[in-house]
């Protein structure tokens, strides 16, 4: 039925628009023309209320493992630079991707320490602690599975605070252990804190290639509590001083961008306060402050937290903290995207090529949906067979729309045809297509993943636009093979140009997604022929040549 064919086109266009609109809404705020230096009233739960200090000047030390290259400031022990050697900045480049950065153009830091009444990071107690370290460079040696970087500070009262970074081979999770030795006569009250701060405006050199047409990924903050497993918090919301202030046992706070994330995970049994803050000068923050801990005189207290700094590898993130893997943002169809990704990853474990894995999963998905596809084509064929009767009825009844509607429904009932029978299978298939889109866009495994020939990065658009053109050709063949009774010249022109419109639209889509649609269209052609043969035997389809 032609109305159902038109519905298919409208649905595809609507879904495409939804994809574009979703990424538009999650896109990071546009740079402002002028930074404001105006002082504002601090919202409850912000950094100032929490006693979280600003960064200071100190000596820089470097820490290198097989997967991390960090720079830590001895003033406060903040991580100010983070390079990821396993992930090049660009395809074919020897320059590693930089996640954390401290430059005049851009700030992105992972801060941590001890605040609270007696904490050395409390601004009321003076400047942030200047830690002593044994050396300026630490390297995880070959055959070494763990690297510890201890930093010590002794206050004026003789109390010793030790902050130790613990790195493990192949791990993007860094434990930060605190030891508080109370040599005084009064209890010390301290609280661990972890804070991520970042410039709202994204300079050109930080562009990860995720801002192409229709491909805007979420960049901002997020947090998790036992009650709210995963909640995003936009940078512009923080910049508007609409700040987060929640208490939670467990959970985490994070900053996200396409493929990569940083997160602080408090490791304690008490209550933590999660907050966001507008720090001014175009910088926003999200962090946590733990419940105060008392260290009695002559005793040593121990506390810990974990910093994730690296790619969004789902299984590794899930092992670090509950729901941390949800930072791989698959949108509202995550419950479909996640199983699809697990299936794709399982296929890749045998095939070894993500492109061929996409081809295989396309066959699997289309195979599962074949009964729906068959039901759709069968319903459309039955509707086509009724067209002569419907046309005769319209001519007989003239402009009497009410009688036309009544007799048409009676005809459907007599012929046992559901006029919406071709729509329901289509509606069911659309979420799967959308889920595949989100999966292919959000999975780090496909970043810089080669396929074959000229396709060296499945997460990027085809540099020569060959795949989008092939996709358009397959759409053209499907259209030519599909029977139609369209007589309106305008509708004919619209249908004729549909493959061209979709080809142009897909020029900027990642090649992995376009590859999926090409294979899906080829499967459609095969399934179409099989279904039509069965319909011919039932007298519901004829091989008449389509009118152009």
Swiss-Prot record:
UniProt key word Chaperone: yes
Q: How does this chain sit within the bilayer?
A: Multi-pass membrane protein
| GO cellular component assignments | plasma membrane
According to its UniProt record, where is this protein located?
Cell inner membrane
Q: Write down the superkingdom of origin.
A: Bacteria
Subunit-level organization:
Interacts with the Sec translocase complex via SecD. Specifically interacts with transmembrane segments of nascent integral membrane proteins during membrane integration.
Task: State the function annotated in the UniProt record.
Answer: Required for the insertion and/or proper folding and/or complex formation of integral membrane proteins into the membrane. Involved in integration of membrane proteins that insert both dependently and independently of the Sec translocase complex, as well as at least some lipoproteins. Aids folding of multispanning membrane proteins.
The protein, known as: Membrane protein insertase YidC
Species of the source = Salmonella typhi
Its taxonomic path starts at: Bacteria, Pseudomonadati, Pseudomonadota, Gammaproteobacteria, Enterobacterales
